[in-house]
Each structure stands twice: as structure tokens, then as C-alpha cells.
């Protein structure tokens, strides 16, 4: 399986790895088929700008690379702008992914949406965007 230089760079040197304590939004998604689990943390200011974004991913190299790239693509943008992130944009930013790894980019998109949904829930804003519920991991009680 051939990976682009960007995929390898984001796998070997992932950006924004870690957790944000008291994050305004936290999203967890997973895919049983591949075994990948992504957790995304968002720090959001009073103007709805994502000032920091971190992730923890348990999974393959493509899952780590797509998580890393997704954080880079949304940091500094508004929450509304982050919701426009697509898996295709993540793939393009990484200069492509093998077809069998495209699902990792879908998880990265869904992790961002899941974190935004958590933020919206915390501030009482309605969730007015589509969530792929089959990959969203239920909240721990």
C-alpha cells in the first residue's frame, strides 16, 4: 500500500496530539471494521473560533494522519467553518489515501462534527447538521 509523503509525515510526526482539559467540545467516533477510535478535543473562544484542537487516535497510520490533518484544517476557524470540513478535503490535503483507507478520513470528519455537537449540546444550541450515528461512540455515563 502506497502512502503520500504528507500521509507519512502526519503519521510519523502528528500535529496536535493530546487532550485539552475542560475542552468546550469533545467528540469520540469509532469504526469496528478497522478498529480505529478517534477522540477530538476543541477549545473554542467567545467568538466561536477554535483556538486549539487536539486528538487522540487508536488506529492505523492513516487514522492518525487524517486526525492530525483535520486538526490542522480547523484550528483558527469558526465552529461553523469547521462543520464544512469534508473527508474529501482531508484526503486532498494529504495528497490522497489508498481506497481501502478512505474510511479513516470519514472518521476524521465525523470526529470534528461529534466534538462540535458536544459543544452545541453544552451551550444549548440546536444541532442542525447531519451526524453519521453508526460511528459515533456513545457517551460514557
Task: Write out the residue ranges for each language-model feature.
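Short, thiol/selenol-centered motifs that function as redox-active sites or metal-ligating centers
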Residues: 34, 57-65, 104
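Alpha-helical support elements that line or immediately flank enzyme active sites
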Residues: 62-77
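Glycine/charged-rich beta-loop-alpha catalytic/anionic-binding loops adjacent to active sites
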Residues: 44-55, 89-93
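C-terminal binding/interaction regions
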Residues: 1-27, 77-81, 85-141
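Structured beta-strand/loop patches that form or line metal/cofactor-binding pockets in enzymes
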Residues: 17-50
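Helix-adjacent hinge/juxtasegments
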Residues: 42, 51-53, 70, 81
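Active-site cofactor/substrate anionic-group-binding motifs, chiefly glycine-
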Residues: 49, 58, 73
Amino acid at each position: 500500500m502506497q502512502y503520500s509523503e504528507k500521509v507519512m509525515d502526519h503519521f510519523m510526526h502528528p500535529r496536535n496530539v493530546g487532550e485539552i482539559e475542560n475542552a468546550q467540545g469533545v467528540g469520540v467516533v469509532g469504526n469496528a471494521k478497522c478498529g480505529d477510535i478517534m477522540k477530538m478535543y476543541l477549545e473554542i473562544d467567545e467568538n466561536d473560533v477554535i483556538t486549539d484542537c487536539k486528538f487522540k487516535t487508536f488506529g492505523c497510520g492513516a487514522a492518525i494522519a487524517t486526525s492530525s490533518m483535520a486538526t490542522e484544517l480547523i484550528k483558527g476557524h469558526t465552529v461553523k467553518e469547521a462543520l464544512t470540513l469534508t473527508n474529501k478535503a482531508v484526503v486532498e490535503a494529504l495528497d490522497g489515501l489508498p481506497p481501502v483507507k478512505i474510511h479513516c478520513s470519514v472518521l476524521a470528519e465525523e470526529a470534528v462534527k461529534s466534538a462540535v455537537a458536544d459543544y452545541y449540546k453544552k451551550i444549548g444550541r440546536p444541532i442542525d447538521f447531519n451526524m453519521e450515528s453508526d460511528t459515533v461512540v456513545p457517551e460514557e455515563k
